[in-house]
Amino acid sequence: MSRSQEELEATLQIAKVNPEDLRSTVHCLSFSSEFTSGDYSLMELDDTLCKQIEAGDSLVIRGDKSDHAVLCSQDKTYDLKIADTSNLLLFIPGCKLPDQLPADQQPLSVIHCEIAGFSNHYWELRRCRPKLKKLKKLLMENTYNGPENESESSQETSLYTTEDLLSVIQSSTEELMDHLKAIHACNIKGIWRLLDFDYEMKLLNHITQLIDSESWSFSKVPLQVCLQELRSLEPEEMIEHCLTCYGKRLMEEGGDCFALDEDKICRATALMLLQNAVKFNLAEFQEVWQQSVPDGMNTRLDQLKGLALVDRTSRPETIFLLQTEDLPEDTQERFNTLFGMREKWTEADIAPYIQDLCGEKQTIGALLTKYARSSMQNGIKLFNSRRPLS
């Protein structure tokens, strides 16, 4: 119902409010004839997300029916949580904010606005880690083992484009692409494929043998010569993909080169040795490992962080495969698994297995304080579970 200026002045007089103490613009509110509750939802955005929306970018809600929904921008992932408010929030199109009203005292004016909706809660966003554990599992359904091993059936099932992956993985586009690179996924004709590990090691072996026969430096492997020499053995795109996975591209005047990463090659070789053994005598493993890497490369145990764990309490000392990617994504479940495997950990041993759980401003120390308790043993700080394990 509309109100006249005289009615407003009379209301202020009854309320004993001096009009000079107020802005001269008055909003008269009424419910829209088409008003229904539940038509709108509110979402709280930070400045960065607001600017992205204003620039025309999209925000996407992702998740299956069984998943807790997340919201994704182009480069970040957010948890969606409902926050209740003590006051009712009204949606009023056309309502003027104080900074949109004249600062000087003007004659009393009335703006009639309709309430389009209301809510007593809103969606609150909290930055979270993308949920990527499912990604490798999906790609492992149909690994790539070279062109000669591709069958019609492998081309018809379990194949994923970028859009296919974004429809089932709770991650922003940039975070997904970064993880695809980290797990050495290869885009073959628009389809993302994981190379069979034995095939990947075969490619790497071709490259390192060529480097040895040509007496090249690992820090300067010429791309074009490498492709020409190995094209009779494997597709050029596979050779270049392997160089990209295990090296860094350098732009040179004479053509692109790759500087191979010693740590990555030593790490892959260790995985090849450990993947079929339950436990390995540490001394014997280190000897075989060093013999298995290309001449001129040096193996070190710190290259195996997040890949393998050394047991120094056993006699003889042993090493076994334990990959971070095989552990639960949930923080509490991760700690339960680790403490179920080993009762007490040093920070150096456990850090590689919880590093990825840290938020933007969270440290490993803060995580350990929350989920573990510390004690001293022979001058060494050890961590064990803060809660009883079932």
Curated annotation (Swiss-Prot):
The keyword Cytoplasm does not apply. It holds the Pfam family Dcc1. Keywords: Cell cycle, DNA replication, DNA-binding, Nucleus. GO terms for cellular component: chromatin; chromosome, centromeric region; Ctf18 RFC-like complex. One of its GO terms (molecular function) is DNA binding. One of its GO terms (biological process) is DNA replication. InterPro entries: Dcc1 (IPR019128). The keyword Nucleus applies. It is found in: Nucleus. Component of the ctf18-RFC complex which consists of ctf18, ctf8, dscc1 and the RFC complex. Belongs to the DCC1 family. Loads pcna onto primed templates regulating velocity, spacing and restart activity of replication forks. May couple DNA replication to sister chromatid cohesion. This is Sister chromatid cohesion protein DCC1. It comes from Xenopus laevis.
